[in-house]
UniProtKB/Swiss-Prot annotation:
Binding site for sn-glycerol 3-phosphate: 108, 138, 140, 193, 246, 256-258
A Pfam family: NAD_Gly3P_dh_N
Protein name: Glycerol-3-phosphate dehydrogenase [NAD(P)+]
EC number(s) reported in the record: 1.1.1.94
C-alpha cells in the first residue's frame, strides 16, 4: 500500500497507535503533532513515552510538527484529537483539504455550545465535502492496539464507497473493521458511553459492588439508546461494537480515563483535582454537560446523565446522586 499516503493529525495515544499500525502495514504514514518535544522523541527514540509508553514505533513512521508538510499529497486524513478540539483542527486543515481526500475522525464527543456531533461540525466547516467524512469507533484502547492485541471496531459515514476504503486501509490480522451505515447511532454510542463510564467509576470509588455497577451500566445503555432513537438512530446499533462494545470496555477498564476519573471523584477528589491527576483529556466530563443540555432540549429522560451532571457541575455529593437513582418512580425495564 506504499502508493497511499495517510496523515494522522494528533500525536496522543490513539493517534500514535493508529499511525504505528498503518506504518507497520506498509502504508506511507505521517504523524503530525503540535508538541515538538513529543515529535522529536518519536523520531529519535521510536517511542511516545508521554502518551503511549512501552510501544515500539515503526522505523517507517515519519513524525512532524509541520502541518503543511504533513498534509501534502495525503489520501486519508485521520483526526485523532479530542472532540472539543475537532473544529479548530478542521479550520487549520481547511485551506489544504482536497476533494478526493477522506477524513477519518476518531473523536468521541458532542461539541459544547452547539451540541453538535462531529459529523455536523465537519459539515459546518467543510460543507462541500460532507460525504468525505467517516468515523472510526468501538472498543479500542490505544494501549492494546499498540501491542497488537486483537481488536474489532466500526467505520461509519455517508458514502458506502468511502467506508469500504477506510475498512480496507485499517484492517490487519489483529485489527478488524466492520462497516455500519448508522452514523448517528455510531457517533452517539461512542460519545455517550463516556458519561456512563465516569458514573461506573464513581461506584467503584464509593466502594460499591458489582451489582451496583452492573445495574448502572445496563440502565446507562437504555438511556443512551433512548436519546439515539429520538435523534433518528437505529436501536440495534447500540447493541453493537460502537454501543455495547465501547460501553463494556470503557466502563470498567484500567485503561479508561473516564472510568479512572470516576473512581477519583467517588473517592472524594474534586473535578479539578481529578483532571490534574489524570493529566489527559477526559472526554466524558464535557460530554456530560453537552448531553444533559441536549436531553433537556429534546425532553429525553436520562437520569444517570442528569445525576452525573449535578455531581460534576452543581455540587451534588456522589453518594447522594447515586442513591437518588434508586428511589426514582417505579417503571417497566425496557422503556425506550
Amino acid at each position: 500500500m506504499g502508493s497511499i499516503k495517510v496523515t494522522v493529525l494528533g500525536a496522543g495515544s490513539w493517534g500514535t497507535a493508529l499511525s504505528n499500525l498503518l506504518a507497520q502495514k506498509g502504508v506511507n504514514t505521517v504523524l503530525w503533532g503540535r508538541d515538538s518535544a513529543v515529535i522529536e522523541e518519536i523520531n529519535r527514540e521510536r517511542e511516545n513515552k508521554r502518551y503511549l509508553p512501552g510501544v515500539k514505533i515503526s522505523q517507517e513512521l515519519i513524525a512532524t510538527a509541520d502541518l503543511e508538510f504533513a498534509l501534502k499529497d495525503a489520501n486519508f486524513l485521520v483526526a485523532a484529537v479530542p472532540s472539543q478540539a475537532f473544529r479548530d483542527l478542521l479550520q487549520k486543515i481547511k485551506p489544504y483539504f482536497k476533494p478526493e481526500q477522506i477524513l477519518v475522525n476518531t473523536a468521541k464527543g458532542i461539541e459544547e455550545g452547539s451540541l453538535l456531533r462531529m459529523s455536523a461540525v465537519f459539515t459546518e466547516v467543510l460543507p462541500e465535502y460532507r460525504d468525505n467524512y467517516t468515523i472510526l469507533s468501538g472498543p479500542s484502547h490505544a494501549e492494546e492496539v499498540g501491542r497488537g492485541i486483537p481488536t474489532a471496531i466500526v467505520v461509519s459515514g455517508y458514502s458506502p464507497e468511502k467506508l469500504y476504503k477506510v475498512q480496507e486501509l485499517f484492517s490487519t490480522e489483529y485489527f478488524r473493521v466492520y462497516t455500519n451505515d448508522d452514523l448517528t447511532g455510531v457517533e452517539l454510542g461512542g460519545s455517550l458511553k463516556n458519561i456512563i463510564a465516569i458514573a461506573s467509576g464513581i461506584c467503584t470509588g464509593l466502594g460499591l459492588g458489582d451489582n451496583t455497577r452492573a445495574a448502572l451500566v445496563t440502565r446507562g445503555l437504555i438511556e443512551i439508546t433512548r436519546l439515539g432513537i429520538k435523534l433518528g438512530a437505529k436501536k440495534e446499533t447500540f447493541m453493537g461494537l460502537s454501543g455495547l462494545g465501547d460501553l463494556f470496555v470503557t466502563a470498567g477498564s484500567r485503561h479508561s480515563r473516564n472510568y479512572k476519573a470516576g473512581i477519583l471523584i467517588g473517592e472524594g477528589k474534586s473535578l479539578e483535582e481529578t483532571q490534574k491527576e489524570i493529566n489527559m483529556v477526559v472526554e466524558g466530563i464535557r460530554t456530560t454537560r453537552a448531553a444533559y443540555q441536549l436531553a433537556q432540549r429534546l425532553e429525553v429522560e436520562m437520569p444517570i446523565t442528569e445525576a452525573l451532571y449535578k455531581v460534576l457541575f452543581a455540587g451534588l455529593p456522589p453518594r447522594e446522586g447515586l442513591f437518588g437513582l434508586m428511589t426514582r418512580a417505579k417503571k417497566e425495564e425496557l422503556n425506550f
